[in-house]
Design a protein with these regions (language model features):
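N-terminal lobe/hinge region of extracytoplasmic solute-binding protein
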Residues: 36-92, 122, 194-198
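Surface-exposed binding/hinge segments that line
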Residues: 89, 133-180
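A short glycine/threonine-centered beta-strand motif
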Residues: 37, 61, 98-101, 155
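Short, solvent-exposed loop/turn elements at domain surfaces
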Residues: 41-48, 73-76, 161-164, 212-213, ...
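Active-site-proximal polar cores
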Residues: 502
């Protein structure tokens, strides 16, 4: 498999190249960006954030020690860029030393210190906070202040992703604010005055259910030309799209299905901008129950392989999600650094699928056309969440394809909380799911190995050979050798067919044409917003800073 490389600049609009942002007092290229968003964050405090919109907002207020460049591999130490730390060096195989940016200050004017870094790592590791990143920090990384501007990170074991673990998961918090508040009370703390970071934007106001506003911080150097960032909250994707179509918003992260994209494309005020997504979708089979009893139908690998052969994945992916959607080579998005691009997966071959079922004893009987093996019909259910019309469309398309193969398939649509409860309890035959990748391939361990049973591996797939390959790949320090091991693991999981890997999305954003210097980072689409500008000749009334 060929290792695909994503360019360091995720996407740059050709029409937006030119001069760098200015910071003069006149600021003719300054203004406001309004973002249409579906839903709103439950919190902005980074250790408690689980929604992508909360991350998008928080990452403009708070900073990491360093940033991974778009397209960079977590094992590549040259792919990291200074952020709150101006430099770092390796001390030994278990230790990294970071030097904080000279003059770094919190937005209330207090200096950022190594003590803040120590405090932040401790908070992320605390079971009381139970941050999403806690498994990567607790018992694995210890922060020690060497002086006020130098911090040493000590790791429990060697790993090629130490720099990634030291910088990607933790946003640095002000100890002088949060250290005085019991951690058990953090989630209930609603004091917006506590939302103080060291990043380029400061919190300004939040009208719950309506909007949230950030303002460029005067201490930032250079001060961003986009002086105000406003999120307009919509209850559903249609309402968010309407904010674009009525010109009330400048940006929409994901327009959606092809028919929706065509509506925006017809509006001359906006660019329609495709860029790779970190999302991949799949249909997962339940191979066994909690007691180890194989599923009467889907526990048979011949059935799973036949169902995979009978699914025209390229057609399904592009007809439902639009051009640019790929069929992944395994459980990964287009962005994961080990991705080999659009392979088409296992070839679409309905004749081969039928022969495979025949040879495994699943034969058509009677006038129904439904296959049976003994008294067991080839019958199962596909569970989908009501919150995703596209996943429902995927399930219905597969249902029809498998009906022609001789399978009796029912599609069950349930509310989101019920969907999650049934997955956790193992009360399903199969389900259409989607995962959001992070840059590291280690998420595969939680999703598809034996250690993920009771966690994200709802289908209870477990192959020691696959688990071993992932473990070896995660310990390998050489990028190419690591990728080769991951690819061998993908060949193994595809042969076992515990799931059908259906689509790796391409996002399509709506971007107002007056915006300049736009670069969209697929892992954090607003990360470069502090460097954006407004075309002076195209300024709108909302760009006024008065």
């Amino acid at each position: 498999m060929r290792l695909r490389h994503i360019a360091p600049v995720a996407l740059a609009l050709a029409a937006c190249t030119g001069r760098e942002p200015r910071s003069s007092s006149a600021c003719s290229d300054c203004g406001t960006v309004v973002i249409a968003a579906t839903g709103e964050p439950s919190t902005l405090l980074p250790p408690l954030v689980f929604e992508t919109i909360g991350r998008d907002v928080g990452d403009l207020i708070y900073e990491r020690l360093a940033d991974l460049a778009p397209g960079g591999a977590p094992v590549d130490t040259a792919a990291f860029r200074p952020r709150l730390a101006s430099s770092w060096e390796r001390v030994d195989s278990l230790t990294l030393r970071f030097h904080l940016r000279p003059g770094a200050r919190w937005q209330d004017g207090r200096p950022v210190t190594a003590g803040d870094v120590v405090f932040s790592f401790d908070a992320y590791a605390d079971s009381v906070i139970d941050a999403g990143a806690r498994p990567y920090i607790a018992g694995r990384i210890k922060a020690v202040a060497e002086d006020s501007a130098t911090v040493r990170l000590q790791f429990a074991e060697p790993s090629p992703e130490q720099l990634y673990d030291a910088t990607y998961h933790v946003r640095i918090l002000p100890a002088h604010i949060w250290g005085a508040i019991p951690r058990a009370s953090w989630a209930a703390d609603t004091a917006t005055a506590h939302l103080i970071g060291s990043g380029p934007y400061r919190f300004r106001r939040w009208e719950h259910g309506q909007s949230l506003e950030l303002a460029a911080d005067s201490l930032a150097s250079p001060m961003p030309a986009i002086r105000r960032v406003i999120w307009r909250f919509a209850p559903d994707p249609d309402a968010a799209l309407n904010l674009i179509l009525t010109h009330e918003a400048d940006l929409l992260e994901q327009i959606g299905t092809p028919d929706r994209v065509s509506r925006v494309a017809g509006d001359k005020a906006y660019w329609v901008v495709p860029y790779p997504s970190a999302v991949f979708g799949f249909l997962s089979f339940r191979l066994s129950d909690a007691n180890g009893r194989p599923h009467p139908v889907l526990g048979d690998p011949a059935v799973r392989r036949a169902l995979t052969l009978a699914a025209d994945r390229p057609l399904l992916a592009r007809s439902i999600f639009g051009p640019g959607t790929q069929v992944p080579t395994g459980p990964m998005s287009q962005l994961l650094w080990i991705s080999a691009g659009d392979s088409g997966g296992t070839a679409y071959d309905t004749l081969a699928a039928a022969r495979l079922l025949d040879s495994a004893g699943w034969v058509r009987q009677g006038n129904t056309g439904i296959r049976r093996r003994g008294s067991q019909p080839l019958r199962f259910d596909v569970l989908v969440p009501a919150t995703s019309s596209t996943r429902r469309n995927v399930a219905v398309a597969l249902q029809e394809a498998w009906r022609r193969l001789g399978a009796d398939v029912n599609v069950t649509v349930v509310d989101g909380p019920v969907f999650q409860e049934r997955l956790g309890a193992g009360r399903f035959d199969s389900y259409v799911g989607a995962y959001l990748d992070e840059p590291s391939a280690r998420g595969l361990v939680d999703q598809w190995t034996r250690s993920g049973w009771g966690g994200l591996n709802y289908g209870r797939y477990g192959n020691p050979a696959f688990d071993s390959l992932l473990s070896r790949a995660g310990r390998e320090t050489d990028r190419q050798r690591s990728a080769a091991l991951y690819h061998e693991a993908m060949d193994t999981i595809n042969a076992d067919a515990p799931a059908i890997f259906l689509y790796a999305l391409t996002n399509t954003a709506a971007v107002h044409r007056r915006l300049r210097h736009i670069v969209l980072d697929p892992f954090s689409w607003l990360a470069t917003l502090p460097r954006w500008t407004i075309a002076p000749e195209a300024r709108l009334p909302r760009d006024s800073l008065r």
